[in-house]
Amino acid sequence: MDKVKIALQYMLPKHLLSRLVGKLAAAEAGALTTAAIKWFIKQYKIDMSEAAQSEPEAYKSFNAFFTRALKPGIRPLDMDADIMVHPVDGAVSQLGPIKNGRIFQAKGHHYSSLTLLGDQAEDAKRFEGGDFATIYLAPKDYHRIHMPIKGTLSKMTYVPGELFSVNPLTARNVPGLFARNERVVAIFETELGPLAMVLVGATIVASIETVWAGTVTPPTGKQVFTWEYPTQGPDAITLDKGEEMGRFKLGSTVVMLFAKDAIATFAEGVEAEAVTRMGQAFANLKDVKHAD
């Protein structure tokens, strides 16, 4: 059955399907929208007591429901200066060192950090010998993405690609999954060197958004696009630790890349398949801070 599911993913018109779902999710259909939201809550056992608006009727569209805010204080932020926090609610897929420009995806599968970053060689070089972490956001999860540490945006790259599902089954069976799906790469300058936040698209993900650019995709592009940003002066975009940096409409994956020597150790309990909650301790930082 697993082989059939994977084969279907290769055959389906994934972009067309995703855009169709996106249009439906954006529709404000009154009682029909409310019914769909109620079904989704029941199907995925979503705890609406955490949401700022807990009643399904409060959401005019499915997208509004899916990108719902949480109640203030529901995800306390670890403010220890030597701690990096989880950027999302989800589950760790994999994490570890970047070796010879390769990132571990699943047993028998690695992929290139250069390809992940849209073939931006200078960017890939900055993360050689560093660490990575891949976090999967299931449909039930809170889908806003936050900063693990304070950073100033220096570059954003849109990379066109496939829209395979990014669930654990697909990660185990589709080679180079995260480096072949459509994605948005945001690079920040931090006290510990560069930080890459890679927002990976997936089947029926209606859009990828950032707080500084709004909706980046759709529309789907056919070539790599890059935007550069000032890191100093009044136009610099600096986001604090825990501040929202983007969001998905429907579930997907975030891949983080860290500079060499940025991370001392991952926090206790942070390992493959571990559940993550935004704001909790993710990693212990090196004592010696540097600028790239």
UniProtKB/Swiss-Prot annotation:
One of its GO terms (cellular component) is plasma membrane. InterPro entries: PS_Dcarbxylase, PSD-B, PSD_type1_pro. The record marks 251-252 as: Cleavage (non-hydrolytic). GO terms for molecular function: phosphatidylserine decarboxylase activity. Its EC number is 4.1.1.65. Its cofactor is pyruvate. Binds 1 pyruvoyl group covalently per subunit. The keyword Lipid biosynthesis applies. Pfam families: PS_Dcarbxylase (PF02666). GO terms for biological process: phosphatidylethanolamine biosynthetic process. Pathway: Phospholipid metabolism; phosphatidylethanolamine biosynthesis; phosphatidylethanolamine from CDP-diacylglycerol: step 2/2. Is synthesized initially as an inactive proenzyme. Formation of the active enzyme involves a self-maturation process in which the active site pyruvoyl group is generated from an internal serine residue via an autocatalytic post-translational modification. Two non-identical subunits are generated from the proenzyme in this reaction, and the pyruvate is formed at the N-terminus of the alpha chain, which is derived from the carboxyl end of the proenzyme. It is an enzyme of class 4 (lyase). Keywords: Cell membrane, Decarboxylase, Lipid biosynthesis, Lipid metabolism, Lyase, Membrane, Phospholipid biosynthesis, Phospholipid metabolism, Pyruvate, Zymogen. It catalyses: a 1,2-diacyl-sn-glycero-3-phospho-L-serine + H(+) = a 1,2-diacyl-sn-glycero-3-phosphoethanolamine + CO2. The active site is at residues 89, 146, 252. It is a peripheral membrane protein. The modification Pyruvic acid (Ser) is found at residue 252. It is found in: Cell membrane. Belongs to the phosphatidylserine decarboxylase family. PSD-B subfamily. Prokaryotic type I sub-subfamily. PANTHER family: PHOSPHATIDYLSERINE DECARBOXYLASE, PHOSPHATIDYLSERINE DECARBOXYLASE PROENZYME, MITOCHONDRIAL. Catalyzes the formation of phosphatidylethanolamine (PtdEtn) from phosphatidylserine (PtdSer). Heterodimer of a large membrane-associated beta subunit and a small pyruvoyl-containing alpha subunit. This is Phosphatidylserine decarboxylase proenzyme. It comes from Shewanella baltica (strain OS185). The gene is psd.
